[in-house]
Amino acid sequence: MDKRTIGILGLGVFGRSIINTLCKYNCDIIAVDDHDDVINHFEPVLARGVVGDITDYDLLQAAGIDTCDTVVVATGENLESSVLAVMHCKSLGVPRVIAKVKSQTAKKVLEKIGADSVISPEYEMGQSL
């Protein structure tokens, strides 16, 4: 099986948790976050870590997001940021884009613009209890 490349956009609690899980597997991880301390912390396990704005198309392209098999838009705080990140990933030709959201309204928006999977961990955990 070929080595997969996974992009993580936003390294809050959710994004960091994904990296901690993925680093146990044979995959390349590209991470983008606007906090250099977080990128520096994970640098040993990243194929590439980029400090910058996940809504910046040129930055995502320069980071190599277009080479990813899957990208997780791990920020759910700001709908505009999530929308732009999903749109840019799809424009860059990423085959599978997963987005995290906080509300069902945001979920509908991101599904409408082309996110392949939209998850709401808080909502889903609340439903499963």
Language model features: what each stretch is:
Residues 1-129:
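Cytosolic regulatory regions of ion transport systems
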